[in-house]
């Protein structure tokens, strides 16, 4: 699973989901992308499941870029534990995805293959997404 090698703070405050994505809203690497329509925390397991779904569908052709990384730990206290005695231990890692963020990019495959691969990946994620592709001038647009 994806997680940082080391972090400055082991148990930070929970990440915010307010607002739209500041960066990463345009295609940078690939020809096709999967863009978030709504915000959510995406866990490292969900990112990995989406990556596997894309990889299996496109087989050996094409290249995949993952533009999100789970760098926020989410803590949990054990079940039936009394209140107090500090903050819980880190349980899993999440990436904060805000509306407009391009999460996955693909290149080297046809549009039909990319559309289906990203559709399969979107079923592994807990948010609404849309397929975007690079225009002739270089800008991305939705379809």
Curated annotation (Swiss-Prot):
A single BP term in Gene Ontology: translation
Q: Which GO cellular component does the record give, naming just one?
A: cytosolic large ribosomal subunit
Q: Which domain of life is it from?
A: Bacteria
Xref: InterPro entries: Ribosomal_uL16, Ribosomal_uL16_bact-type, Ribosomal_uL16_CS, Ribosomal_uL16_dom, Ribosomal_uL16_sf
Quote the SUPFAM superfamilies the UniProt record gives: Ribosomal protein L16p/L10e
Q: Note the Pfam families from the entry.
A: Ribosomal_L16
Task: Write out the biased-composition intervals (Basic residues).
Answer: 1-21
- Segments of this protein annotated with the region Disordered: 1-22
Sorted alphabetically, which keywords does the UniProt record give? Ribonucleoprotein, Ribosomal protein, RNA-binding, rRNA-binding, tRNA-binding
Gene Ontology molecular functions: rRNA binding; structural constituent of ribosome; tRNA binding
* Similarity comment: family membership: Belongs to the universal ribosomal protein uL16 family.
Q: Which NCBIfam families match?
A: rplP_bact
Assembly? Part of the 50S ribosomal subunit.
HAMAP family in the record, alphabetically? Answer: Ribosomal_uL16
Q: What does this protein do?
A: Binds 23S rRNA and is also seen to make contacts with the A and possibly P site tRNAs.
Q: What is this protein called?
A: Large ribosomal subunit protein uL16
Q: Which gene encodes it?
A: rplP
């Amino acid at each position: 699973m994806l997680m940082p090698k080391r972090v400055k703070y082991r148990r930070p405050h929970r990440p915010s989901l307010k607002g739209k994505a500041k960066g990463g809203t345009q295609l940078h690497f690939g020809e096709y992308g999967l863009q978030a329509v709504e915000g959510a925390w995406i866990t490292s397991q969900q990112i990995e499941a989406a990556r596997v779904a894309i990889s299996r569908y496109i087989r050996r052709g094409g290249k995949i870029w993952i533009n999100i990384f789970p760098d926020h730990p989410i803590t949990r206290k054990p079940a039936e534990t009394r209140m107090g005695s500090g903050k819980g231990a880190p349980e899993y890692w999440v990436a904060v995805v805000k509306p407009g963020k391009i999460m996955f990019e693909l290149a080297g495959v046809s549009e039909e293959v990319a559309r289906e691969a990203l559709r399969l990946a979107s079923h592994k994620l807990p948010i609404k997404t849309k397929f975007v592709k690079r225009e002739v001038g270089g800008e991305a647009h939705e379809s």
